[in-house]
Structures are given as C-alpha cells and as structure tokens.
Amino acid sequence: MTEMRHGRSRLLRRPIAAFTAVIMALGVSYLGISPANAANANDFNAGNIISDELFYDGYAMSAAQVQDFLNQRVPRCTIGDPGRTAGMTWGNTSIANQCLRNYSMNTVSKAANPYCGAYVGRANETAAEIITKVAQACGISQRVLLITLEKEQSLVTDSWPTVRQIDVATGYACPDSGPNWSANCNPEYYGFQNQVYYAAWQFKVYKAFPSSYGYKPFQTNTIQYNPNPACGTSQVYIENWATAALYIYTPYRPNQAALNAQWGVGDSCSSYGNRNFFMLYSSWFGSPTLAAGTPTGEVKELWTVNNGIRLWGWALDPDSITSPVQIHVRFGTSWAAATADQPNSSAETLYPGSGPNHGFGMWITAPPGPQQVCVW
C-alpha cells in the first residue's frame, strides 16, 4: 500500500499508451496491440479515480485474456540472463525463479465468506489463473488486480522480479510505518496467492464497513498528499465506493507536481500510488471513469490478411443490452463501420439477459506498410 516497494522500483516507467493496433498489411507481420488510450495525468479526478462499474466487475477478463496480457507486457522473461540468475542475491532479497507471465504455484483452498466466494486451490496454478479466480470469487476486476500488482511492485512489466516483489505483490499488510515512512510488511501475508486474495478481499471489506475507515464515499474527506504530514492535506469529495477503497488502500492524493510530471517524479511532497493507478488503467484499458451506460466491448482478435486486416469481438450498450450497437474502425485516413449483431457469447456472459448476438467481425482493405488501427 506504500508508494515504493523495492530497490528496482519502475513505477514511473511509461507503459504502452494507445488504443491501437500497429500492423503490416499484405500478411507480413502483426507488430502489437494495446487495448487503451494515451494517459494524461492532468485528467486525474481526485474524487473519482475509477467507477464502481469497472472496479467491482469480477468477470472483466478471462484467465486466457489475463495470460495474453501478461505475455504482451513481458514478451521474454530475462531471468537466467547474465547477471540475473534465479536465486542470486539482490539487495536484501534475491532474484525470483519466474516472471509473472510464467509464474505458477500450488494454491490453497479458501472457504467462502461474506466478502468472497470459495476459492478451490490446486497444484501448479498460474498467476493468470490466480488473478482470475480471485477476481471472480471476490467481485473485483482482474484489471484492478493487474494494476495493483504493477503500481505496488511493477510485477506485470518486470522481466526479472525479486522474491520480495512476489512476497508482497499487492502491498497488502504493508503500512507506511517503517523508518522514513517505508513499507513495514507483515510476513504472515507473504506469497502471491495470499497477496492477490487479501487485496481483493480487503477492497470488499472496505465497502461492507464504510464507517470503520478514515475515507468515506459520498462526503468530503481530508486526504494527505504524502506520508509525511508536513506536506499538508486537501479536501476531496469522494464520489463512489471504488475511489474510497483506493484511498483507504493507498491513503494519499497526488499533488500538482506529481500530476504535472505525468509518469515522472514530482517534488518531495509528491505521491504516486493513486496517480499511477489512474495512469496505468488509462494506458492499458481505457478510461477508468466509464459512466454507467457507456457502450462497452472488446476486440478479441486482429490479424493481417492479403490486402487488409480482419478483426472480431463484441460490443453492447449497458442501457439497452438487447439492442445492437455500431462499431467504427479507423486506419490511416480511412474508416469503416459494422453492427455488433452476430453470434458471440462473451457479452451475455458479462451481461446476463443481453442475448447471444452482440458480436462483430470485419474485413478491411488496407494498403501495404505499417497501419495504425483504432476501434470504437
């Protein structure tokens, strides 16, 4: 829950930031896809960091989608490269055996409780499976858990994490009570499954007992800028449960210097946890403050073919879940449109009662050479 966790903190590193796919037409090579827009820290709204709709969506991603996302963030794990041998001492910890993209562990079962459903453990469960199962059990978005892993320990993008990073993966039970407001983590909650589970569990507890915590939704709160009280406070009207949960978990508001710095370093009173949550979510998944009823969907796959590209996915309007919506695709100076009215079960899984026909598929002519494709 603190701002920095380990000696190689990379929380200020800029991730990929465009809701585009860059491709080579004529079937050459697909260079990459990132499912989000460019982030701007000055769009940060202290009272509404993320909407409840997005935060409490336990079915935002499947395990396969989480795994694909981890693979995109770290195309190659560099543990084992010269100077990065697994088990090698690094500061007061050691280099881990695995990156998050290929991490696995034997998980334990956890009984259902008022905040999370039952979790059935098994041998050799991957990080993607753990993230997905915890999200579904506790009703916290897989995207939120991925962002938490990144803002706390840079685990999503680190190609050679340390044991310490994995032990305190989400910063759960790590209050800023150490020397100079450093993290003071409780070893009882070490371990990847523990950290992911208890972070999600804690987010639900915050909502169940709002009067038990210092920051409350739907009222004005006094929030520090930094763990150092001398840096002062500000008044923030917290607009929803999700934003309150983020402030309870990481109890600081970024100051103007932190926001002006975008992904960089502000001043001695800057804090970055909630700024980075907003920036990472915006960069990776689009706006975190999606209003209820905003059309939503997903490009499931995009690939090159001779003379063009193909893509498919699903989309719907939560205000009218049985009605088809229009999809628009722009590439270069050209654009195309389609109606999301084809068979696809993804929408109905996330929005029961919406029906099976919210899919779309498109073939688009494109000239040779690199193309930037935007879908909305």
Tell where the protein language model's regions lie, with residue ranges.
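N-terminal secretory signal peptides that target proteins for export/translocation
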Residues: M1-L12
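C-terminal segment of classical bacterial N-terminal signal peptides
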Residues: I16, A25-P35
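Non-catalytic cell-wall polysaccharide-engagement segments
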Residues: A39-G80, A173-A292
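Substrate-binding clefts and substrate-entry loops adjacent to catalytic sites
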Residues: N113-A118, L155-Y190
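Long, low-complexity serine/threonine/glycine- and acidic-rich segments characteristic of extracellular
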Residues: A292-W376
